[in-house]
Amino acid sequence: MYKKIISSELDAALKILKNFLKNEEQIENIEKAAILIAKSFKNKNKVISCGNGGSHCDAVHFSEELTGLYREKRPGYAAIPISDVGHISAIGNDFGYDQIFSRYIESIGLPNDVLLAISTSGNSINIINAIQTAHRKKMKVIVLTGNDGGQVKHLSDVEICIPYHGYSDRIQEMHIKIIHILILIIEKEMKKIN
């Protein structure tokens, strides 16, 4: 009954993946991002992740794979998603939703920590504020974006952008794949010291 839809959806995802694979700069940026995060862990720093909606779920998933395990047993790594409901509702109420991430980073971010900011559009004001706060705190910034990268494109140390101008779910599908690759490379880098 829905086989055509299923095939069409999988085919569309495959086309985006194949196009991304042709972009050598973005492939290099994935490697740079993973090495940057591993270097932070090696130096006893942490990675803080944030995003809105589905990107928020990706930020949480990224952190839980690092504090727990991905494919192999190993020590947990210092990864914190900005996902505390009490914090989000308090800051949203008292300061505004545009500051829910930046206030958290202001509170716990340290020099040489890493912020992984995830935004399919690259234009979410609370993500932009988080990035600006991270820079003030002398943190490194990695962004996972889509479309043309939006406003965050020029605010990051490393940008990984899915150049797709359609529904955001296609971008999110690529983001979760990239997140898993980042974790795989981080684990390999961390093995060099363990």
Curated annotation (Swiss-Prot):
Belongs to the SIS family. GmhA subfamily. It comes from Buchnera aphidicola subsp. Schizaphis graminum (strain Sg). Transmembrane segments: none annotated. One of its GO terms (molecular function) is D-sedoheptulose 7-phosphate isomerase activity. It holds the Pfam family SIS_2. Its EC number is 5.3.1.28. This is Phosphoheptose isomerase. The reaction produces a racemic mixture of D-glycero-alpha-D-manno-heptose 7-phosphate and D-glycero-beta-D-manno-heptose 7-phosphate. The gene is gmhA.
